[in-house]
Swiss-Prot record:
It is a peripheral membrane protein. Belongs to the SecA family. Coiled coil: none annotated. It comes from Acidobacterium capsulatum (strain ATCC 51196 / DSM 11244 / BCRC 80197 / JCM 7670 / NBRC 15755 / NCIMB 13165 / 161). The keyword Cytoplasm applies. Residues 938-953 have a biased composition (Basic and acidic residues). Zn(2+) binds at C981, C983, C992, H993. One of its GO terms (cellular component) is plasma membrane. This is Protein translocase subunit SecA. It is an enzyme of class 7 (translocase). NCBIfam families: PRK12904.1, secA.
Amino acid sequence: MIGSVLTKVFGTSNERVVKRLLPIVEQIGALEPEIEKLSDEQLRAKTAEFRAYIAKAVEGVDDEDEQHKAIQRALDDLMPEAFAVVREAGRRVLHMRHFDVQLIGGMVLHQGKIAEMKTGEGKTLVATLPCYLNALAGRGVHVVTVNDYLAKRDAEWMGKIYEFLGLTVGVIVHDLDDEQRRQAYAADITYGTNNEFGFDYLRDNMKFDLKDCVQRKHFYCIVDEVDSILIDEARTPLIISGPTDQTTDKYVRVNRIIPALEQGEEIEKGEEKILTGDFVVDEKHKTISVTDEGWEKIEQLLGIGNIADPENWDLKHHVETAIKAHSLYKRDVQYVVKDGEVIIVDEFTGRLMPGRRWSDGLHQSVEAKEGVNIRREDQTLATITFQNYFRLYKKLSGMTGTAETEAAEFDKIYKLEIVVIPTNRPLLRVENPDVVFRTTQEKYFAVADQIAELNKNNQPVLVGTTSIEKSELLSQILVRKGVKHVVLNAKYHEREAEIVAQAGRLGMVTIATNMAGRGTDILLGGNADFMAKQELLKKGMARSISPAEGAINPMAAQGMLRFYYQGQEFETTQENWDRVFAQHSASVAQEREQVLAAGGLYIIGTERHESRRVDNQLRGRAGRQGDPGASRFYLSLEDDLMRIFAREWVSTLLQRLGMEEGVPIESRMISNRIEKAQMAVEGQNFEARKHLLEYDDVMNKQREAVYGLRNQLLAGLDQKELIVEDYVPNILSGIFDEYAPEKQHADQWNWEEIRKKLIDHFGFDYQVDGLDVADLTRHELGEEVFSRLKERYLAKEQFIGEEPMRYHERMIMLSVLDGLWKDHLLNMDHLKEGIGLRGYGQQDPLIEYKRESFDMFEAMMNRFQEDTVRYLYLMQIVGPDGQPMQVPTRLRPADASPNGVVHAEPAPLNGSAPIPEQAAPPPPPAIPTRQPSTTIDAIEREFEKKKQQELSHARMAGGGDGSDAVNTRRVGEKVGRNDPCPCGSGKKYKKCHGAEA
């Protein structure tokens, strides 16, 4: 009660946010007459003026975070004038002037928030305001779209404004090479899809040279259709993977027995739940449970012993996955089979997702079920979730027509506030109440009757369905009724934009899956733009442009115009375009009046989606920019949402109402119940995404550390100091802690193992080197061994030269790190698979996952130090004649160094290849020797080969700065976590350099 009174007095928080921006809108409006007087050259010169202001603001500021703050303050100062400049450029170049509400949308985006704008309110044009403003900083602005078509279209369309104002525009699409990508990212504003941006980030962190990387730092990002990308896509991580050597026979073997299994159900008897049959499917949680009888039958069918035995665990997992593939994954619903390949269908948009694969053997199980070629399981080489990728940006914002229902998730995961932008004109769409039928069949016949009725009046109709299967079922009914219509689903997605653009024409009936052409406006009377393109192509008045040509020369030549049609780029003369476009514009204007008289676009929903957002998106296709329109949902009590999430309530309702066949009901009670079911599913899906993020956050800290170290190595980190002053002492401390404990007398130390480990890690034999260890204390032993090892390293560096040594240090460190990281990702996958079972032992799986993954990561980094040091100390030197040369173990005058060629064993990417030892001096016969193998040239070839293999396997399946190197030496004594830090700060080691280590 008090809340509603306060709202009436002060307005909602959203209204207050918008109200605070109105004075700036007035300020921009006041600048308009002055800006209008400027010539094109003077308007363009404003860009250089703004850039000079920003450069002055960051002068003398070295700290990166402080620089960012200074830039943001400068941009805030420039915003009114910069927005006025963009508004004028839009009017001159595109003949489109930004409305006041669009200026508000632009300010919200600049502030790093989400702007919710209704369909048809011009989100694409709104983005030009913050894009231009933030691009002035010269740090790069990324605009993320849901597909390549929209990225190309928006870059070409809005790029005219940016180019007019002296900025550059780039587009990232699937088929570009690295050089083209680098050029696109170097532009002031870069358009592309979320997948391309994410994969480029992962690929950059697999490169061996900074100049090969394509992306810049992550400064500012605007995500179009932000709900689709940051919410719907968030459950699927980006994965770059490579094939393993596992066979696919097991999938065929398991698939054969599934038809012999009987699906049962869960029966409640009091408090007890009884499972019947061989397995039970839980559609609500998308899981299956195999009964004891089912496991016995499976054991017989497979001809194995106890399925629970450790040697059969893998088989057990494949059986459960195969049952899921057969019972929960339906053809033409979750996937389609096209050209002998299983392609996933996006559950939210209905679009095909070629190249993306389900993980955990599920995709292979579906391939076995469909009898197509089964691809081997892949091993993860690099991975990141969209949540963690987009959190890399210093500033993130987004725009969509439907985000308010997910406000809590945007705030919790991304710290993004949603601001609902007022519409430019009042909304005239009529939202009719839902009608509910008893069965699916009754519902579809009623929908067909309604379409036929509306079609008599020539009113355009857009029908939304939840799957390919259901869109084709309705199509068959309409064919029998003689109603002409167009079907748009994942099977015909190539024509998506074209079909949706014409859905507002007189008498048009369009059946669409949930994609409903997001990103393409439905204009009443038709889309003159598309009609002009069709005519130009039909009459041969436009030529095709290759992707490479389009990437190298993104802008059309003088007097020419470029456009996109069905995913391809074409070019025609400006004169041809103007003439043809004018003709179609006139006919469209005439037809529009007829459509308005018929009532505008009518939206029919045939089923409620799990997410209220998707329903709102469908409704939002009608009534754009104050046009009339209407919407209604037709439902049945057999719909998935009702059947799975409100089954008991539905059966009770049927008995109470005694519904008759073909008679619909309209009830607020049913609508409320449906909304509650949707909210329950949204909550469940949010928990699933949050669960994924909690686990990926653990991995993210490790990824930041590894990628941070990689970036430091590529940027010229002093790896020599890191190796000699940190890694070598760490390894020595480990050896002495294990075989020469401080509390033991020297007589009890394991001298044989100490000697063996020193030879194994460093090729150093203290007996051959003449070091008398008999009377040395633990501390003296450590210092003496370290001193000699350091001199050996410096002698080797002197022998081959500083620059070659730095190069080989970097190459070996990167190779070892990449190999171990790849293995670590595989181990983390295995850990995640089994960690859920810890719950049965009253342990929190997430806490156990954090603890064990930290131990695994620590072990990996220790192995990294050991392998790096071993390779560098055991490198062979080969002379011009190809014969091994003896490497000096003591420093010599610099002019005595011969020009040797370095030879070494390639650093293994799997961490298991044999390690060569130093050629001279040879170790004593008592210690087994290891043979050298190939030259550094071979190492480089091997590195490059493996990198190219890994990058070529990049596909869809689903940095941080790093810490500074610790320079404190730990030789002889190991510093405890609670001991005072040796640096002399007075802090505990774990709170000082121990935290960095």
